[in-house]
Amino acid sequence: MSKGTASMGKRQKRTHAKCRRCGSVSLNVHTKQCTSCGFGKTSRMRTYKWQAKCKY
């Protein structure tokens, strides 16, 4: 039950793959959801108001 250097060597599997909708390497292999565009979770593209720079 260690959480140090010895357990870090066991991390070998890929968590994220390339998304086929947005192309970024953000598609979670286990949940099959893209954290960048929302593919697999919603049919619309994932966007938020806080992503854009403020005009003033």
UniProtKB/Swiss-Prot annotation:
Name the record gives this protein: Large ribosomal subunit protein eL37
| InterPro entries given in the database record | Ribosomal_eL37, Ribosomal_eL37/eL43, Ribosomal_eL37_CS, Ribosomal_zn-bd
Quote the SUPFAM superfamilies the UniProt record gives. Zn-binding ribosomal proteins (SSF57829)
Q: What is the lineage of its organism?
A: Archaea, Methanobacteriati, Methanobacteriota, Stenosarchaea group, Methanomicrobia
User: Which processes are annotated in GO (biological process)?
Assistant: translation
Residue ranges of the C4-type zinc fingers? 19-37
| Gene3D superfamilies xrefs | 2.20.25.30
Family matches, as Pfam families: Ribosomal_L37e
Q: Name one GO cellular component term.
A: ribosome
Q: Which gene encodes it?
A: rpl37e
Similarity remark: Belongs to the eukaryotic ribosomal protein eL37 family.
* Keywords, sorted A to Z: Metal-binding, Ribonucleoprotein, Ribosomal protein, RNA-binding, rRNA-binding, Zinc, Zinc-finger
Q: What does this protein do?
A: Binds to the 23S rRNA.
Cofactor: how and how many bound: Binds 1 zinc ion per subunit.
